[in-house]
Amino acid sequence: MRNLRRRASLAAAIGITALSLAGIPAQAGTGPSLAPTARTSAWTALPAAPVAFAAAETHKGARSAASGEPVCTAPYINEDQRLGPKSLPQKGVLGRILRTYVPLGGLPPQKFLDRYWDWSVNFYRFPPDFGFAHSGGYPNGRPLIASKTLRVGERVDRFGSENGAFLAPYGTPYEERGIPPTSLDTFPDSPEYPCNYHVYRVIKEFAVDFGPIASAFQQPGGGSQYHLVSRLIAEAPQNRDEVAVGWLVQNGYLVRLN
């Protein structure tokens, strides 16, 4: 039984990596369906344009203060990549973002997976309505979504690849973001982004869907999220509902800060 469980965990971990690299949005769910979809805008990756102070602050928290070992990589909780890394940053911006985060919300690993893992798609169940909170906190309440313009100079961030279509105000605590623990896993082929964390500055204003984040994955939510939608960005490809972060970088709306 133990070997079967380990094989199941390995298969699930492979599925996580494949879905993440395919561009599963990493900020919230993707609409009324509980299963996420890989909707991305076509773009070509550009060389990073790092800004020294942001990169230094982010990577300052890339190793555990206690052990000096790499963080946000193996070992994983319960030896299961789906549950996120055991070792998390304690310093820098990542340390501040994770300071009050309680992994799995204190649930035992198997109970957490039973509650939030969808075996039919081999990924997590996301809240409906793109992860936005509902009026009055009621499941049948109105989704709390408004339009907002991000101004030049604002800093935003995300946990997840640039194929995703969600951002948050810079430094939003992890437990307020409505994302699963696996979003903290550092991509093996992108070790320069510990915890899969990316920071950007707005260099050309654009509009987004904006609102509070629903509780999810045993975390309270309550932070703000920016959903990148093509109907609000005239220059974006209109054959998709969402706009990838990478497209905004390539087309001069965002600049990477780490």
Where are these regions (language model features)?
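ADP-ribose/NAD+-binding catalytic cleft of ART/PARP-like enzymes
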Residues: 43, 47-165, 173-175, 197
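Extracytoplasmic/lumenal low-complexity Ser/Thr/Pro-rich segments of cell-envelope proteins
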Residues: 32-39
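ADP-ribosyltransferase catalytic core
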Residues: 161-163, 171-219
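Secretory targeting and sorting signals
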Residues: 1-32
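Active-site or metal-binding loop neighborhoods of secreted/extracellular toxin and effector enzymes
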Residues: 207-258
